[in-house]
């Protein structure tokens, strides 16, 4: 994990989960020139009521063909010398910390990058959720666990012989330009997933909380019959 002194206070994560949402956080970042913070719109919550707020543990996936040996020490074997077709995936999973989000990109979306057993391990470790640039599987099992997962949807084909993790706790970038560094804040809800740069997370959360209060005031003005044009002229909120 990134240096704990650099991370957003965990109490602020609770505020994000209970008081904020991706739309307002995205608006606040747009206003500050952070305009590529949403992940691709294909990445959606497994269930509409799932919410994620946690620190990024970025994971880099790569396509492969067949059960090939790893390209880095420890990639090709698991404990006891057993062949490990997943590269560094199991190691990355075991190193998840409390409030971290397993967030993965790099491969092509033709196999599942997440499943029930991974969710079980992550939940046991206190992780905040998983976000994958591809599919998940074992949907019913994940629902029973209640572990937040965001993906392209459900597709049972395994990543074994098709993809492997080649690095983790490293910077990653999604196809739409969104960059994720270790310790960035990942927020996901029914409207999508975004990344808040670690160095500006406290500033962004504070501004978003203020904007939520302003939006509530605007809602009351609209209910009283004021025009949206007039309201926007007074508040700059819409």
For the regions a language model picked out, list residue spans one by one.
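Extracellular/luminal Protease-associated
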Residues: 91-119, 123-133
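Acidic, glycine-rich flexible loop/linker segments
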Residues: 154-231
């Amino acid at each position: 994990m990134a240096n704990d002194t650099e991370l957003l206070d965990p109490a602020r994560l609770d505020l994000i989960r209970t008081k904020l949402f991706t739309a307002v956080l995205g608006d606040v970042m747009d206003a500050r020139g952070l305009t590529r913070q949403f992940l691709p719109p294909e990445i959606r919550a497994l269930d509409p009521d799932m919410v994620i707020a946690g620190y990024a543990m970025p994971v880099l996936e790569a396509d492969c063909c067949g059960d090939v040996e790893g390209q880095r020490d420890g990639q090709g074997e698991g404990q006891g010398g057993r062949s490990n077709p997943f590269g560094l995936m199991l190691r990355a999973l075991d190193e998840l910390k409390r409030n971290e989000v397993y967030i993965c990109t790099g491969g092509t979306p033709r196999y599942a990058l997440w499943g029930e057993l991974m969710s079980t391990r992550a939940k046991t470790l206190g992780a905040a959720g998983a976000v994958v640039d591809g599919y998940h599987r074992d949907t019913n099992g994940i629902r029973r666990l209640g572990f937040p997962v965001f993906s392209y949807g459900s597709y049972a084909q395994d990543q074994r012989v098709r993809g492997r993790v080649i690095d983790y706790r490293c910077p990653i970038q999604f196809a739409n330009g969104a960059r994720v560094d270790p310790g960035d804040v990942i927020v996901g809800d029914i409207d999508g997933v975004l990344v808040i740069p670690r160095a500006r997370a406290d500033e962004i959360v504070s501004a978003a909380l203020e904007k939520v209060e302003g939006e509530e005031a605007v809602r009351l003005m609209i209910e009283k019959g004021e025009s949206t044009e007039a309201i926007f002229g007074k508040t700059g909120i819409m």
